[in-house]
Structures are given as C-alpha cells and as structure tokens.
From Swiss-Prot:
One of its GO terms (biological process) is ribosomal small subunit assembly. It comes from Bordetella avium (strain 197N). It holds the Pfam family Ribosomal_S19. The keyword rRNA-binding applies. GO terms for cellular component: cytoplasm; small ribosomal subunit. NCBIfam families: rpsS_bact. This is Small ribosomal subunit protein uS19. The gene is rpsS. Keywords: Ribonucleoprotein, Ribosomal protein, RNA-binding, rRNA-binding. The keyword Cell membrane does not apply. Belongs to the universal ribosomal protein uS19 family. The lineage of its organism: Bacteria, Pseudomonadati, Pseudomonadota, Betaproteobacteria, Burkholderiales. GO terms for molecular function: rRNA binding; structural constituent of ribosome. Gene3D superfamilies: 30s Ribosomal Protein S19, Chain A (3.30.860.10). Protein S19 forms a complex with S13 that binds strongly to the 16S ribosomal RNA.
Amino acid sequence: MSRSIKKGPFVDAHLTKKVEAAVAGKDKKPIKTWSRRSTILPEFIGLTIAVHNGRQHVPVYINENMVGHKLGEFALTRTFKGHAADKKAKR
C-alpha cells in the first residue's frame, strides 16, 4: 500500500534541516543520515547523502530518477555471496 497523497511524502525533520543547510551553503560534503525511511524530494537532486546500511554509510548521489523513492532503496543491507557449488555437478 502506498502513502496517501493528502498526507504528502515523509522526510525526517533533521534530514530536511541538513539538506537546506547544504543547499544554502553550497556544501559538497556528503550528508550522513540513518534515516532510510525518508522519501527523496526534488530539493535533494545533486547532493550526495551517506545512507547507513547497518554497518557503514553508503554514499548515494541523488539524481532526478530517484525522486519519490526511499533513501534505503539505494543502500543495500544484505550481501549475497552465492550458493555453495555442488561438488558432483562440477565433475
């Protein structure tokens, strides 16, 4: 289920403050955040946001195709190493 349009997109208040400060100050330093649930807004375009994936902050450069998605979609939390190979199938 998607979010109601009358409610509007959700963005954490502390992230909004950091983005506004970065845009006003023309700061190119990545913005660190743990807020994976925040929606990407058009104001974020051109910024680099370091999104926490549970272990480290993954830098995500925001472009216009990402608007409307959540920040957590671009910082993967699970690492797939592959299934164990079957020894009989290799021969």
